[in-house]
A protein has these predicted regions:
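C-terminal accessory/connector segments of nucleic-acid motor ATPases
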Residues: 419-545, 550-551, 627-644, 654-665
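Terminal, basic amphipathic appendages of nucleotide-handling enzymes
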Residues: 17, 379-381, 502, 514, ...
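Short, conserved charged micro-motifs
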Residues: 641-647, 677-684
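A generic structural motif
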Residues: 109, 217-222, 306-308, 313, 556-561, 663-681, ...
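Phosphate-interacting basic helix/loop segments used at nucleotide- and nucleic-acid interfaces
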Residues: 262-266, 272, 327-335, 339, ...
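Helicase motor core with emphasis on the C-terminal RecA-like subdomain
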Residues: 2-8, 12-18, 29, 33-53, ...
Length: 745
């Protein structure tokens, strides 16, 4: 009997029947590896393999086998996922698997009926699928029930773990698991699932911290890459492509057809997906909305059927579910324009193509998006399309470089050449989460002495780098502002201001949200926007344009009607960080003469033109370029964090360095004013500063309040500045790059 046969025979009948029903001819390598760790050891497990490789089944087959052989007297498994839609998707998959087993599965989040949840509370058994926010609510509001609900908990499965490591939300989960362990009195095995992860050992440590268990990371077998990949480039041919026909007529302009029809880039993207079941990814909700509206206009103008859907976090649950169901339906043809919400592992069946509008920000994002296509034995297929303004004769040098195209090529080459994936960034000082968990623990446990509260909170894994004296600063601030209150017995309880925060359901989430206004058309909920336009104004949402008919400010409702046209909409947001390796590879692309086989004709021509510019202007030899007169440009080829540090360093020492008028674009270049011939003196002085060591703390001004996370507004400024310098700036890379640039002289 082979090892695979032994594992198969160990599974109960309902799992074997599931395997037969799905016509699997054999267990996959990831399923064999998972079975070995979960059956033969007491280790934690991190599974990293491509989308649709059977990771979920790999984890659950052995776990459910144990629950079948040795039933749990409480909830036996917690499955945590970052999206409600992912939980809904997995719920139906696991429910199908468990149909004949007698093992219960319950999904629990804000959209699930109270009656469904009540059944679990009355009889806690089986598998609980839950979001971090709902788990937080359970810890606060049902603290006394935790031992009964989870007393015999065996496993915690964390899905899409790459989206959580290095974030407040991921650290919140680690706090929650530690708190559950504390309340039930025993450790629980952890299983992490991820399609792409840049630092598996780092993620394994993240998963294991505080458990005392080793985490096994089976090596996924990386075969030869099989992709269908293409990149094409277009210049923006019609600058009025952001304007609707109604707007044009309002401005006294005559236009026969929608402006998008005159733009070859949009036409090309439309043709790429019009006959293929596709996902179209953009890097922001604004771009997603605009592109979906553009596709609909082109379809209307050509007389084609409108098959275009949209999916992002500001849409109503019903609209998102409509897109998911239509994409899953094998009999229905659809194209969905999406953001990161469709990047994760929601099963959408057989997808023929992924279209990427501009370059993704990360290798991780590229692989996740590419992996959404190519299931059932077919290679993944992606087309990246780039659009930029056609440079004018007097366009400055830095704007002659196609940064998006370079980034797209760099991301692909880094994975092909090195299998590089960005490692997760680790936060050392998550003060926003520290504020949140302080209130959460006090709300759950009741009165604690300051010493007991500090001991409990600072023992949680995310806060091991926080000094006691810094936590004391936070606690005093919380006392002074009524978030905490001291009793006559010198104990701490939640104060009046803290109670107000805790009363809102929004408290359970540690990611930043906004006070959104709900948009309704008749009885249908369309989605949410941040700022309400005046009555009569128009805005875009769900790939369509709406005109405001009525505002209900007290209830935060906007009543609208649908109108023709296309407009832009803006949401606040952070576009994420780009790794230094991507910038370094972009430089090599610009300076080498390699012809990349996936570049289409226009993209090849655009890259050749950029290489010609780089060679003629000296970019191939120098990072600091004289643009003429007093204008200079520095190309440091640093990622977001290091670029941010260098920019602050130049600003702080500008007078000493003899520079002024500092401006920048993304993390690509910095321009400034300086006397002609001052470059050597500038770099020599920068080297002297680097030799003394760059103090990141000194780059944050005394009055600065760097607010980024949800509860940063409640954290003292001195702690925010300390966290910013520690977690958002970096000195070593900048010091090295300064020496490298000086070496060019």
């Amino acid at each position: 009997m082979t090892r695979a046969d032994e594992i198969f025979e160990r599974f109960p009948d309902f799992i074997r029947e599931f395997i037969y029903t799905n016509t699997w001819e054999s267990l996959r390598p990831v399923q064999m590896a998972a079975a070995h760790t979960l059956f033969e050891t007491d280790h934690n497990l991190l599974l990293t393999s491509s989308t649709a490789s059977g990771k979920t089944e790999a984890a659950f087959f052995p776990i459910l086998t144990e629950l079948w052989d040795h039933p749990s007297s409480s909830i036996g498994v917690i499955y945590i996922a970052p999206l409600k839609s992912l939980i809904n998707d997995q719920f139906f998959r696991i429910e199908q698997l468990l149909d004949q087993s007698g093992i219960a599965v319950t999904h629990w989040h804000g959209d699930v009926a109270a009656s469904h949840k009540r059944k679990l509370l009355e009889n806690p058994r089986g598998v609980l699928q839950i979001t971090p926010e709902s788990l937080e609510a359970m810890l606060i509001n049902r603290s006394n029930d935790i031992p009964r609900l989870f007393g015999d908990l065996r496993y915690v499965v964390i899905d899409e773990i790459h989206t959580l490591t290095g974030t407040d939300r991921g650290n919140q989960i680690r706090c929650q698991l530690d708190r559950i362990t504390h309340l039930i009195g025993h450790d629980v095995r952890r299983v992490g699932l991820s399609a792409t992860i840049g630092d598996p050992q780092g993620a394994a440590e993240w998963l294991s911290e505080g458990t005392g268990r080793q985490t096994d990371v089976p090596i996924s077998e990386e075969g030869k890459i099989r992709w269908r990949l293409g990149m094409e480039h277009f210049y923006v041919q019609n600058p009025k492509a952001t304007q609707s026909k109604d707007e044009a007529e309002k401005n006294g302009e005559e236009i026969a057809e929608m402006p998008a029809m005159l733009d070859a880039g949009y036409e090309y993207m439309y043709d790429c997906v019009k006959d293929k079941k596709s996902l179209v990814f953009s890097n922001s909700r604004e771009e997603t909305e605009y592109l979906c509206a553009t596709f609909r206009q082109i379809a209307h103008a050509r007389g084609d059927r409108d098959v275009f859907l949209i999916h992002h976090g500001n849409l109503s649950a019903s609209l998102r579910e409509e897109a998911e169901l239509k994409m899953k339906n094998e009999e229905e043809f659809a194209v969905t324009c999406a953001t990161v919400t469709m990047e994760l592992g929601i099963d959408i069946g057989r997808l023929e193509r992924v279209l990427q509008n501009q370059a993704p920000n990360t290798v991780t994002g590229f692989l996740q998006r590419l992996g959404r296509s190519g299931r059932r034995g077919q290679p993944p297929e992606m087309m990246m399309v780039f659009r930029e303004e056609d440079p004018l004769p007097n366009t400055p040098l830095p704007q002659l470089i196609p940064w998006e195209l370079l980034r797209g090529i760099a991301i692909v080459q880094l994975y092909i050449e090195e299998r590089f994936i960005e490692p997760p960034m680790k936060k050392k000082l998550p003060y926003s989460l520290l504020f949140h968990q302080t209130l959460s623990i006090l709300a759950a446990q009741g009165e604690l002495t300051p010493a007991a509260l500090a001991a409990r909170v600072l023992s949680l894994p995310p806060f091991l780098n926080v000094k006691k004296e810094d936590y004391k600063v936070l606690m005093l601030s919380m006392l002074n502002n009524d978030y905490l209150e001291m009793t006559e017995e010198k104990g701490l309880i939640v104060g009046l201001a803290g109670e107000r925060l805790l009363k809102s359901f929004r408290f359970y989430a540690v990611f930043k949200d906004s006070e959104d206004y709900t948009v309704r058309c008749g009885s249908d909920e369309i989605g949410t926007i941040t700022t309400p336009p005046p009555v009569g104004d128009r805005f875009a949402l769900a790939g369509r344009v709406w005109e405001v008919e009525e505002l209900d400010m007290a209830r935060k409702l906007i009543y609208v009607k649908s109108v023709e046209g296309k407009m832009e909409i803006s949401w606040p947001g952070d576009f994420g960080e780009i790794h230094t390796k991507i910038l370094e590879r972009m430089k090599r692309i610009l300076l080498e003469d390699t012809v990349y086989p996936y570049l289409k004709e226009n993209a090849r021509a655009r890259l050749d033109k950029a290489r010609h510019v780089a060679h003629n202007t000296g970019m191939h030899e120098h990072s600091l370029i004289h643009l003429g007169g007093y204008s200079w440009c520095l190309f440091p080829w640093l990622g977001t964090r290091a670029f941010r540090t260098l920019r602050r360093l130049l600003k702080k020492h500008a007078k000493q360095l003899g520079i002024s008028g500092i401006e920048f674009e993304g993390c690509y270049y910095i321009t400034f004013k300086m006397e002609s011939g001052g470059d050597f003196a500038l770099m020599r002085e920068l080297c002297r500063i680097a030799e003394r060591g760059i103090d990141c703390q000194s780059l944050v001004e005394a009055g600065e309040l760097p607010v980024f996370e949800k509860y940063d507004d409640y954290v003292p400024g001195e702690l925010l500045r300390q966290a910013y310098a520690t977690d958002r700036l970096t000195a070593p890379l900048v010091e090295k790059r300064i020496y490298d640039i000086f070496g060019e002289y």
